[in-house]
Amino acid sequence: RMFKPPAADPTITVDSSHRTLMLRVHDTAQFRAIFAPIVPDHGKMMHLFLVSTNGMQVFAHLHPTETDSLLFKTELPWMPAGRYLLFGDLATENGLSITVTNRIEVPAAPGSVSPSDPDDSWDRTNRITRGFPGMVRPLEDGYSMTWANETPIVSGQTTDLEFVVSDSAMKPVSLQPYLGMPGHAVVVRDDASVFIHLHPMGTIAPVTQRVFAARDRGDTTNRGRLRPLPASDEHTMMASTGQLSFPYEFPKPGRYRIWVQVKPAERVLTGTFDVDVR
């Protein structure tokens, strides 16, 4: 029987200076049957993505902490009120990736708020600032991102989604590691029927790498022996030329939005692109 991701119920409480989101993941019988302990992936217990339903104009990438078994908590940054799609990525010790989904109504911010995690980020786009294949997308701080693909993208075929990050003189820049990778990408179909969190070609998620390492040692039963990789190992795949390539096979035709997150300096920047997949 096909595995069905568990449901997750979000709630938001507001006080004078915080909007606190709590997310409880349901402990279903099917989930327990395949369950292994949830472990950090790229140093985070969960990667939570919020996408506004009004044309996907607002995008947030947050990192809740686990306060109890399957209960997660995060403070929302200063992002506008409204209805949002919610996607929560979890990783288990046996290498399984799980995405929980829901929708949530975000109330207005109480005033000046700060992210609860320095790696949290959010971005707003519109018809002027979004990009398409072959276009240059202006970023903040004088940077820009070019989507290098120029040929049509066809569903059912693996495509390398290629991007280049440049400075104000259009020279490629070196990228600092963001969550152990030179970049991250999120792809969502306009009807929210498809969601994927991608990493660049040539990189591998730390959880998966630990599982492979355990198998190489013949350790396929005692999962408790798995240990995190040193931070230096996670940072070996750094983009020195500002170029990123994300291999992906779009499952069906339609319009998709792609957010690409990079860290050319001490700040996370997000490029937003749309594509019509044939």
PLM segments and residue spans:
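Short, conserved beta-strand segments of beta-strand-rich sandwich/propeller modules, principally
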Residues: 83-87, 255-259
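Short beta-strand segments within Ig-like beta-sandwich modules, predominantly Fibronectin type-III
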Residues: 62-68, 236-241
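Residue-level recognition of secondary-structure-to-loop junctions
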Residues: 66, 73-80, 250-251
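Conserved structural position at the C-terminal beta-strand
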Residues: 88-90, 165, 260-262
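Solvent-exposed, conformationally flexible loop/turn segments
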Residues: 15-20, 82, 154-158, 254
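Beta-strand-rich structural segments
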Residues: 18-33, 158-171
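Short coil-to-beta strand junction motifs in C2/discoidin
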Residues: 35-46, 176-182
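Extracytoplasmic/periplasmic copper-protein system
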Residues: 1-15, 93-153, 175, 179-181, ...
